[in-house]
Amino acid sequence: VTKDALAVTIVYSGGDDVFLVGAWDHILEAAMRIQEDFQTYTCHTLHLSAGILLKNAKYPIRRSASEAAELEAFAKSHDGKNAVTIFEASAQQTYPWQIFQDKVINEKQNLLERFFANQEDAERGKAFLYRLLDLLRNSEQRINLARFAYLLARLEPKKNNPSYAMYAEFSKQMYQWYRNPTDRQQLITAIYIYVYQTRMKGDTDRA
């Protein structure tokens, strides 16, 4: 099966290290392809660690490489090492590859994409997600669960609306994920990824 070409450049490849630069959403796809192909090639006997960093296109390459290496080092410190650290060097943004792909990308980001696919007001959608992010990051405040539920309720269409079934699935999952610490952190990461990937054309972020 031929895979779509990606806007990614190999800056350095040697030994057991590789440094890629490219369109940030393509970097995510490239990282997952490399991980999958490497696991297939080695029959799952070897592991990869990765750091994924988002910077403006004018950010110095040397500094990007250094900071990405810090994220990679953090991923290597994860139990089993077979992990990826994204955005910042923290345990909250470090995931085993399978969890990252299955739970963050295929589950949570996918739901965000499906729900917002038919939303006409993109900027309003982003503002809504930023409000959700604030509540997710401050979940230790008990009142924020009620605020989270209220925000979801404000999106509810009439039950005879064709979009109601999608809303019901979205709101149920979001509420459940908020209440589970592991799912909550994965949702935070998924929202970050979704927001970056839906920025207006003309933005010049790279990874």
Model-identified regions with their sequence ranges:
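Charged, helix-rich terminal subdomains or tails
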Residues: 1-207
